[in-house]
UniProtKB/Swiss-Prot annotation:
Belongs to the pyridoxamine 5'-phosphate oxidase family. This is Pyridoxine/pyridoxamine 5'-phosphate oxidase. It comes from the Bacteria. Binds 1 FMN per subunit. It comes from Xylella fastidiosa (strain 9a5c).
Length: 208
């Protein structure tokens, strides 16, 4: 039996984890970190072949952590076949010896309206680039890409650039958040938040 006060405490653990991330993220943005919103994104194909790359965090809230990409890119194909992912933030300049945040969870596409709104906020040249790029496909030469950019620019001259149909947002809904605080002599501090099969959040202090 889960008592109401304990259940509320478990719910509050997720809010606590998000608040901790938010505070660290703001600290990173105020630090010497060049791209504090950069995060490693690990995915795996349906066959279990892993891959990892750097993407940028565009939004986070209680629903999860959002990034954008082409749905036909390798990461997009992985996530359509196997909608699970892991994220990693590493802020080396924070605290005594850096801070690392790991996040694991299930992935869903954001609503089209949300993707439209974010795409509309991007610089025009970035919007044009999203149309011109066939992400991760072989490219004959840099000049070929420049020609595609010029073609897209001419196509949308004098009007708004709409979001390409295949340019979508992905949201990672956390089931695990782990905070690693680096210290000298490898005497690190690790806190792990995870949700169990019944949907209750737990918090653990881990050996470094």
């Amino acid at each position: 039996m889960i008592f109401p006060c304990l259940f509320q405490s478990m719910l509050n653990l997720y809010a606590e984890a998000l608040s901790t991330f938010s505070l660290l993220f703001e600290e990173a943005k105020s630090s010497s970190e060049i791209e504090p919103d950069a995060m490693m994104l690990a995915t795996a194909s349906l066959e279990g072949h892993p891959s990892v790359r750097t993407v940028l965090l565009k939004k986070f809230d209680a629903r999860g952590f959002v990034f954008y990409s082409h749905i036909d890119s390798p990461k997009g194909r992985d996530l359509q076949a196997n909608p699970q992912a892991a994220l990693l933030f590493l802020w080396r300049s924070l605290r005594e010896a850096g801070v690392q945040v790991r996040i694991e969870g299930r992935v869903q596409q954001v609503l089209a309206e949300e993707a439209d709104a974010y795409f509309a906020s991007r610089p025009r040249q970035s919007q044009i680039g999203a149309w011109a790029s066939m992400q991760s496909c072989p490219l004959g030469s840099p000049e070929e890409f420049q020609a595609r950019l010029a073609e897209v620019k001419a196509t949308f001259e004098g009007r708004d650039v709409p979001r390409p149909e295949g340019w979508v947002g992905f949201r990672v809904a956390p089931r695990v958040l782990e905070f690693w605080y680096g210290a000298r002599f490898r005497l690190h501090e690790r806190w792990r938040y995870e949700v169990d099969a019944a949907g209750y959040w737990r918090k653990f202090l881990l050996y470094p």
